[in-house]
Amino acid sequence: MFDKLQSIKDKFQTIEQQLSDPEVVADQNRFRKLNKEYSSLKEIVRAYDEWSRTKKQLDEAHSMQKNENDPEMRALVEEEAGELQERLPKLEQQLKILLLPKDEADSRNAIIEIRAGTGGDEAGLFAADLMRMYQRYAERQGWSCQTLEVSEGSVPGSLKEVSLEVSGHNVYGILKFESGVHRVQRVPETETQGRIHTSAASVAVLPEAEEVDVEIRKEDLLIDTFRSGGKGGQNVNKVETAVRITHVPSGIVVACQEERSQLQNRERAMKMLRSKLYDLQIAEQQKSRADLRRSMVTTGDRSAKIRTYNFPQSRVTDHRIGFTSHALPQIMQGELDPLIEALRMHDQAERLQAETA
């Protein structure tokens, strides 16, 4: 492991020198590529440097222990050595995690699709609650969150389904564990007997695809236009600005009516289609790895119930990792960091175990 770390540090230093070369700076494509690689190695090199300093200090402390005759000084050195000895394995564990293979999709933006499931009107209201939860979390993270498509439910404030585009730093890598069935237990406002109802909504988080990721042939597309029910001023229900695209080979259908022009809706619909096809490719690749790692967190099995929101007890439980929190109101306001961090740590532990198996 340490030979690999030294090799990474050597490469990091070489890139650092190249980035100050005027010829490299003048070549913007090369400069961007090197700068991206530099950024990806920076955290590993910093952690390796910290480990190296700690190891050197520990070796020096051991040497002083052997040569120190003064009892008081010897006691101080032993105390320092004990602290360093305790710290070193933690730094080594951090390095192992940083060396784990990166999912190239983690750095991408994401599309979140939320659909009401079983439970009637209450499921539609819960889908709207989840949408607001993710919107608020995105706001806390400093991300951009835009609505791509929305279908309202039968009661005010409810949703049949909604698609959100979330843009920012490492969005997909942070949100990918949210894919799955989310269950809610609460007393509906219309319930006169005070009985708790159970309903559900499904969440799918897709990495946003770029045009180079997926080849889409024009002859494989059926494009329909229809009158928009969304914003658009005087054009609403008069001009066919909404767009529906069907990808014939896969059967995937996407639609967008949120923008004011047909061209804008078509561009957004194509973005959604590319992401769905890219997600399909990734899912096929992951099938071959399923026997190696069956963690529901990392495979994103959307058919499984991943989380329960129990409103009467103010409790959220993530069933994949046994995480429980009694801060349900805060979580519904977008305070998801403790939950997401627990999922990421579990994923890291699973991957470390797979690497050493």
Curated annotation (Swiss-Prot):
Gene Ontology CC entries for this record: cytoplasm
Residues found modified as N5-methylglutamine: Q234
Q: Which organism is it from?
A: Chlorobaculum tepidum (strain ATCC 49652 / DSM 12025 / NBRC 103806 / TLS) (Chlorobium tepidum)
Q: Which Gene3D superfamilies match?
A: 3.30.160.20, 3.30.70.1660, 6.10.140.1950
Can you say what this protein is called? Answer: Peptide chain release factor 1
| Function description | Peptide chain release factor 1 directs the termination of translation in response to the peptide chain termination codons UAG and UAA.
What does the entry's PTM section describe? Answer: Methylated by PrmC. Methylation increases the termination efficiency of RF1.
Q: Extract the Pfam families matched here.
A: PCRF (PF03462), RF-1 (PF00472)
Q: Which InterPro entries match?
A: PCRF, Pep_chain_release_fac_I, Pep_chain_release_fac_I_sf, Prokaryotic/Mito_RF, RF-1
